[in-house]
Amino acid sequence: PVNNKNQIIPMYTYPCYEWLDSIDWTDSKVFEFGTGYSTIWWQNKKADYYGVEDNGEWYHKIKEKSKIKYETDLKKYMKTIYDYDFKFDVIVIDGQVRFDCIKPALKKIKDNGMIIYDNSDWHKSSKEELDKTDLIPIHFHGFKTMHVDSTTTSCYIGRKFNKKANHIIPMGGTIREQHSTDKSIL
């Protein structure tokens, strides 16, 4: 999947993608449980990217360009994040054993970080587990590329999250003049 500039985009819901795409992620440490098109997108955003993948075919396609580990033992898969002696700015849960990846993610996320949980509407127990934390949930409902039904990508942000989104022009949208009601008349 690509955007209107022919750049690969992650398979998050469009509202989530647009918000994430408006933020500068340069040098942010990102870990992803389950890699995919988002791997390429995060790297294009100049993030310091790490991940774990259990699909050998995909792993061999992208291993040269990234710090991804290949792991098919799912107990080891969910613990791969502990191989790093630092915490992450962003942790994406979008692969196998999602529920079991929550605890490791919570231990390895920075106070000002964010956990992205894709398809949270498909995983009620996982969503409820994340909702119990002190993280602030933002649920982006909508369509996503290559899907015919809507879904939810949830971002759980730390209370010290300090990344600022730039002005968002929706995909297919146009830049317009400032609307007359967007100014004070007083």
Question: What label would you give each PLM region?
Answer:
Residues 1-9:
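Class I SAM-dependent transferase core
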Residues 10-76:
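SAM cofactor-binding core of SAM-dependent methyltransferases
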Residues 27, 46, 66, 88, ...:
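Short, well-ordered alpha-helix to beta-strand connector turns
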Residues 29-32, 51, 90-93, 115-117:
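Short catalytic-loop micro-motif centered on adjacent basic/acidic residues
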Residues 68-79, 92, 137-144:
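A polyampholytic, Gly/Pro-enriched intrinsically disordered region
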Residues 81-90:
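A short acidic, Gly/Pro-enriched loop at the edge of an enzyme's catalytic core
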Residues 96-186:
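C-terminal substrate-binding/active-site "lid" region of AdoMet-derived donor-dependent transferases
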